Structure formats: structure tokens, C-alpha cells
Design a protein with these regions (language model features):
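Catalytic strand-loop segment that frames the active site of acyl-thioester-processing enzymes
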Residues: 18-66
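HotDog/MaoC-like acyl-thioester-processing domains
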Residues: 18-32, 93-95, 105-159
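Hydrophobic beta-strand-centered segment that forms part of the acyl-chain substrate-binding groove
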Residues: 63-113, 128-131, 136
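Hydrophobic residues in beta-strands and at strand termini
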Residues: 34-38, 89, 137
């Protein structure tokens, strides 16, 4: 694939789409808005790939509260632990930018569920990044996995 300069001099090639679908804002149920910081940039002067993980972690913790999990779930019988993540970077983000982080439950299993996340620059309808987090339901007091609670199953809708 050949790269052609854009406004910033870098053009990022398209990445594979999860679920063979181009996501838009309507695909997400819960939103958190964050602003980029100068310290989020890398040597190429765009938001560093690792900064997105921090943005998504902040948003995911707010989403957990919305779903009914305690903020400090390690003190409770019903909590979560991150099992895995898959991240697709679709386009670069320049600073300063306001980021809208959309989330939704996209899949529910017996002891885990997936959270689909999209990061959108505030004036764009196509995400700059999409990610799937597999979250395992976990009892921290007993140090063991537990079944997914019904409150999570009730929040899942078809893509």
C-alpha cells in the first residue's frame, strides 16, 4: 500500500473492520467525553497509541458504574477483570481534540462479556479507533470467576 501525505504529512492505511462493519455513533449506547493533552502526543505529533488505552480505561470504569458494578469492585463479590483487548487504529488524531468515547456490550458468554468501544473526534462520524474488550466476571473475595449477571445480559443488543 502506498502512503500519500495529508494535512499532517502522514496517511494511515485502512485497518480491518471488526464484524465486517463500519461503525458509526449510532452503534454505541454509553458516552464519555475526554480531551487530549499535550503529553498524549508522540514524536510524530499525533496522539500516541498507548494514550488511547488510558482514555478507554477511564471510559470503561465509568461504563462499569453505569452497568451497576461498584467502583471499587475488588472489594465486592461481583466484579470484573480484563481478559483481553483487540484494538484497531483507523486514523490519526491530532492535538488538541475532544474525543467522544462510545461503548456498548456486543457479546455475552457464560462468564465473560465483550465491550465494543469507538473513539470519535468530536466533529467526525467515523471512529478513529475501535476496540473490543473481553471482560471476565470475577469474585475478588474468593479469587474466582463467576457467571455474567443478568444486568449485563439485559444491556446487550444486536449489532
Amino acid at each position: 500500500m502506498r502512503y500519500t501525505p495529508s494535512v499532517s504529512g502522514v496517511r494511515i492505511p485502512p485497518s480491518p473492520q471488526m464484524f465486517d462493519k463500519q461503525f458509526s455513533r449510532t452503534d454505541f449506547d454509553y458516552w464519555v467525553t475526554l480531551a487530549t493533552r499535550w503529553g498524549d502526543l508522540d514524536a510524530m505529533q499525533h496522539v500516541n497509541h498507548a494514550a488511547y488505552l488510558t482514555f478507554m480505561e477511564t471510559a470503561r470504569l465509568e461504563y462499569y458504574e453505569y452497568l451497576g458494578f461498584e467502583n471499587r469492585n475488588w472489594d465486592h463479590k461481583e466484579g470484573t477483570i480484563l481478559g483481553s483487548m483487540t484494538v484497531y487504529y483507523h486514523q490519526q488524531v491530532l492535538h488538541p481534540a475532544q474525543l467522544d468515547i462510545g461503548q456498548r456490550i456486543s457479546k455475552v458468554g457464560h462468564k465473560s462479556f465483550d465491550i465494543l468501544t469507538g473513539i470519535f473526534v468530536s466533529d467526525k462520524d467515523i471512529p478513529a479507533l475501535t476496540a473490543t474488550f473481553t471482560v471476565v466476571c470475577f469474585n475478588y473475595k474468593k479469587d474466582t470467576t463467576i457467571p455474567v449477571p443478568d444486568k449485563i445480559r439485559d444491556k446487550c443488543r444486536e449489532l
